[in-house]
Amino acid sequence: LVTGNGTVTDPYQISTAAGLKWFRDKVNNAKTPDETKICVELTEDIDLSGEEWSPIGIGQGVYWGSLSYSGTFDGKGHTIKNLSIDNSSANFVGLFGYVLGGTIRNLTVSGSVKGSGHTGGIAGGADGGTFENCANLCVVQSDSTEGGTTGGIIGFALNMDYVLIVRDCYNVGSITGRHAGGIIGQCSWHETISNCYNAGTVTGTANAGAIIGSYSSDKISNCYYLDGSVIRKGGGDKASIAKTATEFADGTVRELLKAGERDKNADPWADECKYLTAADKTL
């Protein structure tokens, strides 16, 4: 199903849905902490059509999980398509259930994700870690009356033990919940969010924000959203900047994102991003 040995220098190479499920089951049935730290690279796009997905990494208790994922998952620019989760009684719902100090990078997800609370396209919950160059195209929903922290990238970020870094990420999926954000539904402290954008509709019954729905920090920089994309009912982030559909379409937002990239010598991630033009903004 996979090649490699799961280390930083020789990560598992995964190219199929069967291989992805094998990895998920290895993490969720880990007998030692090291088994939750295994490293993965995707070598192909993966289609999960016909699969009701169970998340990678299990959130236990209120905010954290002993079987949370703590390794490095590198999508290598690939997409996990047709992700499907419909569990309105579950918390920590997403491709990953709970990430504890891990790294998720270079990954796009599409499909539909529904949970009770702590629900995200990439991860339902996170305590620190790094999420970079990730994109959510999923419709993401959680309970709009209780709990209901919902985000395009991360549903709920506690950041009790680790610093959370989110950079070069975007959402174009529809996000709905009690506390809803295009990138993160709710986060507490110790986070830095930079160079991200939202062009998906975000609806929150308590709090809504284009980047973060409800939060306790203002460490947001160079983040943008499509004007009118947030259906706001209190709360929401105030550090992101609204841009018109014209500014998305004419390259203005693209250039702002490229200017904010960490590595000026690398290929600009914004050049590869979809949905930066009005013509592209379709699901």
Predicted segment positions?
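Surface-exposed repetitive/solenoidal architectures
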Residues: 1-283
